[in-house]
């Protein structure tokens, strides 16, 4: 089974399926066309436009007014990656690094970043073959994108840095040679496209969200079993109670409890006590608030992982290259 990277909305549930089932990925034909079209547009634009383009024909940050000679553009992008690969601290877990690769590929696939198709395809190769760059947890604020962790993630594209492959930490150039992969020669804009972005924080966010959803499911299961064992009442879980308050998660929790306890002889039998303790009666309100929070976080993260987040942003159809702040 193969998941095709495309403009189709990528859900957190689909991300979970890809990771848990070790599903391979590939670029859809439409994604390939968008990537190639954007790169060709950028190359043509650089031949005809005399005005400087930030980070493409200029330096970075405070050096934005310094023009870069054409024969130095590739070296500029390579230098950018190497200079920012300064992460420290504990290593990022392998499953998070793999998720970072997936999200970076998705972000680059929209055709607004100006990268070479070859560059994105190599990231796909890394993902599919579990060639996972060594990335560190500290070194970046995220205020200008996840610069340091993404730089460490992208070093192996150049044959630099280290990767984890088959359980061993190895120099990336050795592993590239085993696969017959040549180091990528970055073209103008590519270093920025790879480093600018939110895939490090998004990967941790998505991973945490997947865990939170699972914990929420378990909380309902444990709560239902506890209510049944306590010989509790199902009355606090009827729809009428929760429809008048209209919090979605609260109603969802109540219905889930009734579903889980359907057919239970204990829950259906007459009760001697008038009401249950707070800890049982308020489960829909407490679990429901958690569900609503998880849903909100999910909506934010899904918007983020379905967006290009580098800078400058390229719009080939409108003949626009704009320096903005979607990396923040």
Give each language-model segment a name.
Residues 149-257, 262:
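Mobile "lid/hinge" segments at catalytic clefts and subdomain interfaces of large enzymes
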Residues 227-328:
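Accessory "access/gating" subregions that flank catalytic or transport cores
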Residues 5, 28-31, 66, 86, ...:
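Hydrophobic alpha-helical scaffolding
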Residues 1-50:
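N- or domain-start disorder-to-order transition segments that initiate the globular core
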Residues 112-138:
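FAD-binding glycine-rich core of flavoenzymes that anchor FAD
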Residues 91, 114-115, 217, 299-300, ...:
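Alpha/propeptide regions of enzymes that mature by internal proteolysis
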Residues 54-68, 72-76, 83-108, 136-158, ...:
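FAD-binding core of FAD-dependent oxidoreductases
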Residues 15, 80, 84, 96, ...:
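Short alpha-helical scaffolding segments that buttress acidic/His motifs in well-ordered protein cores
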């Amino acid at each position: 089974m193969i998941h095709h990277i495309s403009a189709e909305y990528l859900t957190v549930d689909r991300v979970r399926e890809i990771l848990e089932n070790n599903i391979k990925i590939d670029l859809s034909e439409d994604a390939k066309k968008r990537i190639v079209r954007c790169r060709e547009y950028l190359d043509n634009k650089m031949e005809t436009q005399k005005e400087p383009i930030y980070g493409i024909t200029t330096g970075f940050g405070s050096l934005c007014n310094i023009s870069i000679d054409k024969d130095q553009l590739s070296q500029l992008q390579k230098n950018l990656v190497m200079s920012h690969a300064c992460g420290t601290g504990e290593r990022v877990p392998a499953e998070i690094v793999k998720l970072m690769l997936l999200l970076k590929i998705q972000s680059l696939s929209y055709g607004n970043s100006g990268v070479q198709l070859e560059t994105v395809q190599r990231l796909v190769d890394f993902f599919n073959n579990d060639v996972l760059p060594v990335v560190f947890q500290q070194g970046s604020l995220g205020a200008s994108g996840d610069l340091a962790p993404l730089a460490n993630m992208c070093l192996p594209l150049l044959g630099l840095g280290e990767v984890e492959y088959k359980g061993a930490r190895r120099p990336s150039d050795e592993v590239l040679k085993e696969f017959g992969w040549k180091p990528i020669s970055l073209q103008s804009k590519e270093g920025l496209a790879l480093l600018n972005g939110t895939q490090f924080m998004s990967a941790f966010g998505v991973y945490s969200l997947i865990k939170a959803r699972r914990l929420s499911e378990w909380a309902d299961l444990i709560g239902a079993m506890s209510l049944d064992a306590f010989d509790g009442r199902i009355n606090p879980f009827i729809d009428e109670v929760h429809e008048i308050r209209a919090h979605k998660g609260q109603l969802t929790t109540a219905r889930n409890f009734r579903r889980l306890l359907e057919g239970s002889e204990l829950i259906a039998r007459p009760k001697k006590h008038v009401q249950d303790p707070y800890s049982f009666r308020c489960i829909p309100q407490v679990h429901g608030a958690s569900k609503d929070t998880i849903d909100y976080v999910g909506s934010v993260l899904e918007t983020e992982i379905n967006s290009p987040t580098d800078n400058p942003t390229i719009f080939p159809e409108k003949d626009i290259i704009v320096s903005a702040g979607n990396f923040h």
